[in-house]
Amino acid sequence: MKSVQLCLLLWCWRAICCRSCELTNITIAVEKEECRFCVSINTTWCAGYCYTRDLVYKDPARPNTQKVCTFKELVYETVRLPGCAHHSDSFYTYPVATECHCSKCDSHSTDCTVRGLGPSYCSFGEMKE
């Protein structure tokens, strides 16, 4: 009975202390080459903990899939970037996560690298508010 109580206590502690995969507010730097500067935009994305494991002995019959916190549903919003040249397209469309879950990283829609550029990277070096 004590071991069951201990397991329950540890499970509750993990649920409280370790954030699960959930929506979070982030600030991203958006840029267009025609505008030559970056603008900070607030959006919603997924962050948190997903249970995963890396087996010591690899089984070729069973693929080892690491799960990451990623979007389940998203919508796109569009903003007009101020200060762009008159002849250029000053609209920028960016993703907004509306629901999150733990899943395999989809490299077709997500940067699955260990060290990506990050959401605040600006190739022009100048940020406009």
UniProtKB/Swiss-Prot annotation:
SMART domains recorded: GHB
Keyword Transmembrane: no
UniProt key word Ion transport: no
Signal peptide range in chain numbering: 1-18
Entry GO CC: cytoplasm; extracellular space; follicle-stimulating hormone complex
Chief location category: secreted
GO biological process: follicle-stimulating hormone signaling pathway; G protein-coupled receptor signaling pathway; regulation of signaling receptor activity
Glycosylation sites: N25, N42
Cellular location(s): Secreted
GO molecular function terms listed in the Swiss-Prot or TrEMBL record: follicle-stimulating hormone activity
Disulfide bonds: C21-C69, C35-C84, C38-C122, C46-C100, C50-C102, C105-C112
Source organism superkingdom: Eukaryota
Keywords assigned by UniProt, alphabetized: Disulfide bond, Glycoprotein, Hormone, Secreted, Signal
Function: Together with the alpha chain CGA constitutes follitropin, the follicle-stimulating hormone, and provides its biological specificity to the hormone heterodimer. Binds FSHR, a G protein-coupled receptor, on target cells to activate downstream signaling pathways. Follitropin is involved in follicle development and spermatogenesis in reproductive organs.
Oligomeric form and interacting partners: Heterodimer. The active follitropin is a heterodimer composed of an alpha chain/CGA shared with other hormones and a unique beta chain/FSHB shown here.
Family: Belongs to the glycoprotein hormones subunit beta family.
PANTHER family documented for this protein: FOLLITROPIN SUBUNIT BETA (PTHR11515:SF17), GLYCOPROTEIN HORMONE BETA CHAIN (PTHR11515)
Protein name, per record: Follitropin subunit beta
Native species: Meriones unguiculatus (Mongolian jird)
